[in-house]
Amino acid sequence: MDILIGLLIIAIGSFCQSSSYVPIKKVKEWSWESFWLVQGVFAWLVFPFLGSLLGIPAGGSLFDLWGAGGAGMSIFYGVLWGIGGLTFGLSMRYLGVALGQSIALGTCAGFGTLFPAIFAGTNLFEGNGLILLLGVCITLAGIAIIGYAGGLRAQNMSEEEKRAAVKDFALTKGLLVALLAGVMSACFALGLDAGTPIKEAALAGGVDGLYAGLPVIFLVTLGGFMTNAAYCLQQNIANKSVGDYAKGKVWGNNLVFCALAGVLRYTQFFGLEMGKSFLTESPVLLAFSWCILMALNVTFSNVWGIILKEWKGVSAKTITVLICGLVVLIFSLVFPNLF
């Protein structure tokens, strides 16, 4: 029962993250860099900070926890993850919600599982290490199939249909950006690993296992915010869009929807940490929890892609290929449990 509860919590967080781009469509009169920065304030600073407060032992502080070790590396990996988050947003811009998230999150699922194992010295050619490696290979196969579906989609759609579904649709550029986003986004998992001493200190201080990892998440998202804020402000200056923040008549509307997008985006990590606390009885599921989250994100993002009509006008063959790719990705998560 605990495992089912853990998976359900992760699934809820995944659904929220995959829904985070829907409120963004309600933002008015702001350039991409402006709304990305404002939603980032909520997604990577405000809500992670509030969540981290739940992981502080009685009579302690965040600084006490961070002093346990690993804080600097968590922030560093967060900076790298921030590059992934930034290019992740660009992949949505060029490919749309469905295809962009599928490729970026699929790549992130594979490398986010493999990188921690490599750094931990795991032998990838025997035992559990081999299972991890094969699971990643299956994940990458799913990505390739989804990429092929994107190619079919581009061939079968007119220029007008492409622009109607995704304003800045650009397949080649989008694929490259999405792959980079996936690899760099996998650094989030490394940031969590680096912060293990902090989580252990929280547990030793009597914090419930549900919340013990939240102070580490704040460090990783803090690093990510640094990267994204620097880029967005540079783009504000280059594109002369700084004036977006002075458009008082849309501030109320835009702030609400950016905050909503931010809390939805953060919920995936909040749910991941809470869900993992229920998976301790299954080491395999615990090791693959990152992959589980990413695969669910891919599934839900494509559901939103269909709802938002991003696949409108494509052939039945293209949809079939897309579904096959998703099935392969989902199988990559089931695969480790077969042994």
Model-derived features: where do they sit?
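Polytopic alpha-helical membrane proteins, predominantly small-molecule transporters/carriers
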Residues: 1-339
